[in-house]
């Protein structure tokens, strides 16, 4: 029997996504604090539930499409809204920034649903799609 505990390879429960402009440059507030977004990792129940809800919507749409129902089609607006819903569900906080005085889920949905801020949603989706972004820091030297 090995002494290696495989759980030491588990990913963190959260990750911090740096906010970048459309050119890929990290952004900071007026005091020099970095803008970031804290998200649930793919190794959490919250992420799993959000992903499952997204997959159910897609499955329902496919069934409706196969049955010739009108609600089997996804518009561009639907796609944007559904992506915003998923990202909102996996977001814990926006750090050092906001929009229009909003807070919580309304703020998250507002940013993720704004096509002019689409690069932020793109970055968050890309970040959570790579489990390596959630690797725990090593405790050994």
Range-by-range predicted roles:
Residues 35-36, 66-74, 107-112:
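Charged, low-complexity surface segments at secondary-structure and domain boundaries
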Residues 50-57, 90, 114, 127:
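Residues that form generic nucleotide/phosphate-binding pockets
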Residues 94-141:
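C-terminal charged interaction modules
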